[in-house]
Each structure stands twice: as C-alpha cells, then as structure tokens.
Amino acid sequence: ELEDLCDLSVRSLEELIDYQDYPVRAAEIATLGRRSLGVGFIGLAHYLAKNGHKYDSQGAWDAVHKLTESFQYYLLRSSNQLAREKGPCADFGSTKYSDGILPIDTYKSDVDEITQERLTHDWDTLRTDIKEFGLRHSTLSAQMPSESSSVVSNATNGIEPPRGYLSIKKSKKGP
C-alpha cells in the first residue's frame, strides 16, 4: 500500500507543478528547475499503536526504520520512473543524487545504535537507475509539523507522539 501511495503522491504533485500559475517569474524558474516536492507522513503514533508498538520501544524504532526506508525508496523510485518518462529535472546535475549519493549514504549513523534492522530494498539497482536516468525531482520528502493537516485527517501530527491521552485541536478555519 505504501508503494502505491508514494507513487500517487509523486505523480499528483508532479502534475501540480506544471499546472500551477506562477505570479513571480523567479519562483517559476526555481520551481521548474528543481521540481521540489515535500511529501511527508502524519499519524506515526497511530501507525505504531495499530501495530502494537509503544512509541519509545525497540519495536517502534525497528518499525520506523522499516517505514522510513520504504518511504524514501518508493519516493525515489517513482521520481526515477518519471524521469524515464519525461526526463530529469533541469537542475538534476547539481543534486547529490547525480553523484549517486542516496539517503542510505547520508543518514545519521547513530541510528545503527538503536536498531539492528537492515536495509530491505534494492538500493544498488536504484542508484544505478538514478545515475542513468536521473530524478524528476531534486527533493522528495519533508517531515513537516503538519498541525493543520492532522486536524483535517483526524490524525496525530507527523512524527510527533501525542501530547496526552486527549487532544483538542482547532484549525484557523474551524474545528
């Protein structure tokens, strides 16, 4: 399911970049050159609870490792597929990805001290494909606070744990 959601997110936001009216020429140039996206997730606490993990447990840390690896992998693979279909973003050559550097190469190695989970996706093939075809987007993921979108979705904020057993949230646009 995550694979399909990541692909749908990348392809939908790709269409919005081209559909968007840009009131400032500089914004249009920057956006079309880099085609940056900011796909993140909300409801991590719910995901962990639903899968039987306390937020600060070893099981949770292992589950988050698996989730975030898959999330990054599927986003990159979708962008790589779009690059095959439409070409890479104009500024691809100025990204770390053009040098074959992937998130698995730059993550904070302290993570290895809290989880022994190993990588499960075929990163070597993806690296080769990215070097050959590029990426359609220079940035794909972002972990935003997501306060207002979590209200609309009736979910917990992004990656944050709940603040208490009961939370009452209101958006500026109403309950």
Short names for language-model regions:
Residues 1-175:
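Long, C-terminal-biased catalytic regions of enzyme "large/alpha" subunits
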